[in-house]
Amino acid sequence: DLNNETIEDWNDHFKVNLMSGVELSKHFLPEMIKRDWGRIIFISSECATLVPSDLLSYSVSKASINVFSSGLAKLTKGTNVTVNTIVPGSTLSEGSKKFLEETALREKKTKDQVEKKFFNDVRDSSLLSRFLNVTEVANTILYISSPLASGTNGASIRVDGGSMGSIL
């Protein structure tokens, strides 16, 4: 929560999640526009929309990626350069694996039991009711980085197992 996150936590999240992308975009976008081709892909998070109260700095930094990406895409108007954001849901990353292992050990449960409880209690909006595997997210990144995605620009593409429910 807000009282447990330091200013350093906030600065770190913004440095890693937003400012690294700002710096890379400033460096590479002009050449992409000059060549009239390129792909800039940001990785956001479902936490940018489904904001957990214990992850405020992380969530706000991820939401800022969505805003930056949308604005940056407008600078590519009339070119073959695209700027998009991938918005993954709960993914079985190294951090998630560690969470499952530590929670299972602490609560004397199996990792499967912890995962089931997480999707029943915390992320009950997920239609998959399981963690995404990294390959599911990577496949979307592969597509959006390819020439096949030439018609997609300025989009936030959800790979969330249905957790953010939307008709758009």
Locations of the language-model features?
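Active-site helix of classical SDR
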Residues: 25, 61
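Short C-terminal tail/terminal secondary-structure segment
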Residues: 50, 141-142, 148, 153-168
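Active-site loop immediately N-terminal to the catalytic Tyr-X3-Lys motif
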Residues: 2-3, 50-56, 78, 129, ...
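Short, small/polar-rich loop/turn modules that mediate ligand/substrate recognition or access, typified
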Residues: 77, 82, 152-154
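Residue(s) in the substrate-gating loop at a strand-loop-helix junction
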Residues: 45
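Catalytic Tyr-X3-Lys loop
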Residues: 3-23, 37, 41, 65, ...
